[in-house]
């Protein structure tokens, strides 16, 4: 469960990211594909080469979903319900992939904002991404 300070840390970090969220989402997705090649199996129709427009566009979708989650932090199940249905019933994404992408998002944010990436912020973002992952996989049961 996210504490009030966790929510404040996540919101403050997301505010600092600002217009770069889509860029960072694409970078994190590229990093996921490079570090965990099995994640590529869900995107056979994508050009997965570095700098691919398709990867950048999907990364922006990921970032937009996270921005929505940050804005609706008090009701993540409602905010992510459509995405949860999509990933569970249509795409059938292995739940472990959410953890892999979450890790790559943390690395990407730490690379771009090292001064702001304090242990407390790191812990709050990790809890937030874990909570988002839990919500996204809740329909798998």
Swiss-Prot record:
<dbReference type="GO" id="GO:0005833">
    <property type="term" value="C:hemoglobin complex"/>
</dbReference>
<feature type="domain" description="Globin">
    <location>
        <begin position="1"/>
        <end position="141"/>
    </location>
</feature>
<dbReference type="GO" id="GO:0043177">
    <property type="term" value="F:organic acid binding"/>
</dbReference>
<feature type="modified residue" description="Phosphothreonine">
    <location>
        <position position="137"/>
    </location>
</feature>
<feature type="modified residue" description="Phosphoserine">
    <location>
        <position position="124"/>
    </location>
</feature>
<dbReference type="GO" id="GO:0005344">
    <property type="term" value="F:oxygen carrier activity"/>
</dbReference>
<keyword id="KW-0479">Metal-binding</keyword>
<dbReference type="GO" id="GO:0046872">
    <property type="term" value="F:metal ion binding"/>
</dbReference>
<dbReference type="GO" id="GO:0019825">
    <property type="term" value="F:oxygen binding"/>
</dbReference>
<keyword id="KW-0349">Heme</keyword>
<dbReference type="GO" id="GO:0042744">
    <property type="term" value="P:hydrogen peroxide catabolic process"/>
</dbReference>
<feature type="modified residue" description="Phosphoserine">
    <location>
        <position position="49"/>
    </location>
</feature>
<feature type="modified residue" description="N6-succinyllysine">
    <location>
        <position position="11"/>
    </location>
</feature>
<feature type="modified residue" description="N6-acetyllysine; alternate">
    <location>
        <position position="16"/>
    </location>
</feature>
<feature type="binding site">
    <location>
        <position position="58"/>
    </location>
    <ligand>
        <name>O2</name>
    </ligand>
</feature>
<keyword id="KW-0408">Iron</keyword>
<keyword id="KW-0007">Acetylation</keyword>
<feature type="modified residue" description="Phosphoserine">
    <location>
        <position position="138"/>
    </location>
</feature>
<dbReference type="InterPro" id="IPR050056">
    <property type="entry name" value="Hemoglobin_oxygen_transport"/>
</dbReference>
<dbReference type="InterPro" id="IPR012292">
    <property type="entry name" value="Globin/Proto"/>
</dbReference>
<feature type="modified residue" description="Phosphothreonine">
    <location>
        <position position="134"/>
    </location>
</feature>
<feature type="modified residue" description="N6-succinyllysine; alternate">
    <location>
        <position position="16"/>
    </location>
</feature>
<feature type="modified residue" description="N6-succinyllysine">
    <location>
        <position position="7"/>
    </location>
</feature>
<protein>
    <recommendedName>
        <fullName>Hemoglobin subunit alpha</fullName>
    </recommendedName>
</protein>
<dbReference type="GO" id="GO:0020037">
    <property type="term" value="F:heme binding"/>
</dbReference>
<dbReference type="GO" id="GO:0004601">
    <property type="term" value="F:peroxidase activity"/>
</dbReference>
<dbReference type="InterPro" id="IPR002338">
    <property type="entry name" value="Hemoglobin_a-typ"/>
</dbReference>
<keyword id="KW-0561">Oxygen transport</keyword>
<comment type="similarity">
    <text>Belongs to the globin family.</text>
</comment>
<keyword id="KW-0597">Phosphoprotein</keyword>
<comment type="function">
    <text>Involved in oxygen transport from the lung to the various peripheral tissues.</text>
</comment>
<feature type="modified residue" description="Phosphoserine">
    <location>
        <position position="102"/>
    </location>
</feature>
<keyword id="KW-0813">Transport</keyword>
<feature type="binding site" description="proximal binding residue">
    <location>
        <position position="87"/>
    </location>
    <ligand>
        <name>heme b</name>
    </ligand>
</feature>
<feature type="modified residue" description="N6-succinyllysine">
    <location>
        <position position="40"/>
    </location>
</feature>
<feature type="modified residue" description="Phosphoserine">
    <location>
        <position position="3"/>
    </location>
</feature>
<feature type="modified residue" description="Phosphotyrosine">
    <location>
        <position position="24"/>
    </location>
</feature>
<dbReference type="GO" id="GO:0031720">
    <property type="term" value="F:haptoglobin binding"/>
</dbReference>
<dbReference type="GO" id="GO:0031838">
    <property type="term" value="C:haptoglobin-hemoglobin complex"/>
</dbReference>
<dbReference type="GO" id="GO:0072562">
    <property type="term" value="C:blood microparticle"/>
</dbReference>
<dbReference type="InterPro" id="IPR009050">
    <property type="entry name" value="Globin-like_sf"/>
</dbReference>
<dbReference type="Pfam" id="PF00042">
    <property type="entry name" value="Globin"/>
</dbReference>
């Amino acid at each position: 469960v996210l504490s009030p300070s966790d929510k404040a840390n996540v919101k403050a970090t997301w505010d600092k990211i600002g217009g770069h969220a889509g860029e960072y989402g694409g970078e994190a997705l590229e990093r996921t594909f490079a570090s965990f090649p099995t994640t590529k199996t869900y995107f056979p129709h994508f050009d997965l080469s570095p700098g691919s427009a398709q990867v950048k566009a999907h990364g922006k979708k990921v970032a937009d979903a996270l921005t929505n989650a940050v804005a609706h932090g008090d009701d993540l199940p409602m905010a992510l319900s459509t995405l949860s249905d999509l990933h569970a019933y249509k795409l059938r994404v292995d739940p472990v992939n959410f953890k892999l992408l979450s890790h790559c998002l943390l690395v990407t944010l730490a690379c771009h904002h090292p001064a702001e990436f304090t242990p407390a912020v790191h812990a709050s973002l990790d809890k937030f991404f874990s909570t988002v992952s839990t919500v996204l996989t809740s329909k798998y049961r």
